[in-house]
Amino acid sequence: MHILQVITGATLVSVPFVSAIPSSTSEFLPSTAEQNSAVLHSQGRSPPRLWTRLRDSIIETIWRVPSRQHNPSRIPSSLSIPRAPSSIRARYGDDVVLRFTIRSQNDVQALIEASNILFLDIWASTNEWVDIRLAKDVVSSLLGLLPSSLRTAHVPIIHDLAQAVYESYPQPVSSVPNPHHAFSPSVQQSSETQNIFFQDYQPLSVIIPWMRLLASMFSTHVRLVNLGTSYEGREIVGFRIGVRPANADLPTERRKTIVITGGSHAREWIGVSTVNYVAYSLITGYGKSRAITKLVEEFDWVLIPTMNPDGYVYTWETDRLWRKNRQENNLQFCPGVDLDRTWGYEWDGSDSRSNPCSEDFAGDGPFGGRESKVIAQWALNETNHHNVTFVGFLDLHSYSQQILYPYSYSCTNIPPTLENLEELAIGIAKAIRLTDHEHYDVSSACEGSVSSHKKRRGAALRSMQSAGGSALDWFYHDLHVRYAYQLKLRDKGGYGFLLPKKNIVPTGKEVYNAVLVFGQFLLGRGAQDIDWEGDFQFPAHSRPNVPEKEYRGPDEEYEISNQLEDDDNENDTLLGFRTQKV
């Protein structure tokens, strides 16, 4: 067992748990299924090996982890999920989430106007539907503002938001819930169910020590970068993964760099976890996977798990559904700006975006958000003074399962590299689909999700959430990043921002495979002698029969024959598109 597995588990145990629900942590109880599963594991597991017993003994002694000996008879035979406590009920009341089916641009405009009047929280929108959060007693007011075509074109997707929020929080742990698996945070297929870090969402107080641990353990190709400080003084930390010439902080040639970000909107926890998953896969795959080794040698990868640390902490401590950052505004009772509306390119402060109480408040001017400003300054400084050329940008959000390319601010202005943007986006969508059969739509960020038959008819509708001032447009236009995308991750609305923890690893695998496709495309001809498909990660239930391989170093040559068929049973290979050397 790798020593990293031991230390990482111990780090997670030793970091105090950040209470997700103030004053009510004692009300968390594991589900019946989880407890029964724990009993079955304890009864059916073979005795641990000597090294395992020694390892656990050391950890238990140093970090005072309780012994794994327990009495299964003390576990209740039947437990139901408790009702949300009063603190949650007081905040979310009788709120629900409704999905409206849209059929025309008039429907979109009507929903925009009504939502602005009532200051409603638009959760997500596509070319076919819009999800809106509102109190039950506001439903009649909303319907009264809508045309007849929309008054019956809606269904509830979350009936009791307070209960859904309560059930989305991780349960506090005073000890390791399953000590046999506690110190094995590998992302390898065989250890998927034993990975303690990715078994649940993690607070910032756990993420930062975990990042420092990885940087110290893999110092040959990993270091932490501090991009600046947030409004409340927290460091905005990222991984820089890449192999540079020895003792050369300033490379002689411009270093091609790819940026992957998450957590711009605080409530989108799956984006934070997915950035961490991809980072871990790149870090631990170097020297073992020929594909990853090539990517780490040819590019620097800067991965920023949360661009909005203040907002992210606030979602753990106070309001799970907080979206904006936490800076003060002219209205003291409506703090925060939507960071993804504050970037400098085509900033738009009109309509609801000029109201500090709006969920998409764009601030008082370009770069009015503290965090977007410092990240932009960092990127410009890297370009102007550190010989860096940014060649790729992936901004992870949730939800609705979409791959969006520039522009967000306009559907009439066409990006000059549209053909290449669409080609790579389709390749990314295909990689995700082959991972776990999840379908991601591809479109311009100014539109909703556009199916192919609607696109042929010219029926694309402008998205309710498209706007100027996005990170996507700024990186593409102002920083001249040729391949910039926003990925809206799982799901399509069953849970929305409250995606259950069982989706963390599958979503991570989807985006990891997408990153492989992304890097392969940017490598151009240099990628042609590598079996990229052989390095794909698959969930256990959908993993194809491919031969196992072991890569012992950057110079080792090997050949593996493996062809994957797509969902339409076509005979083309997954990565059969044209590559583009950048």
Curated annotation (Swiss-Prot):
GO terms for molecular function: zinc ion binding. Glycans are attached at N381, N387, N571. CDD domains: M14_CP_A-B_like (cd03860). Zn(2+) binds at H265, E268, H397. One of its GO terms (biological process) is cell wall organization. Residues 21-172 form a propeptide. Residues 561-582 are annotated as: Disordered. Residues 561-571 have a biased composition (Acidic residues). Residues 1-20 form the signal peptide. It is found in: Vacuole; Secreted. Binds 1 zinc ion per subunit. Belongs to the peptidase M14 family. This is Inactive metallocarboxypeptidase ECM14. The lineage of its organism: Eukaryota, Fungi, Dikarya, Ascomycota, Pezizomycotina. The gene is ECM14.
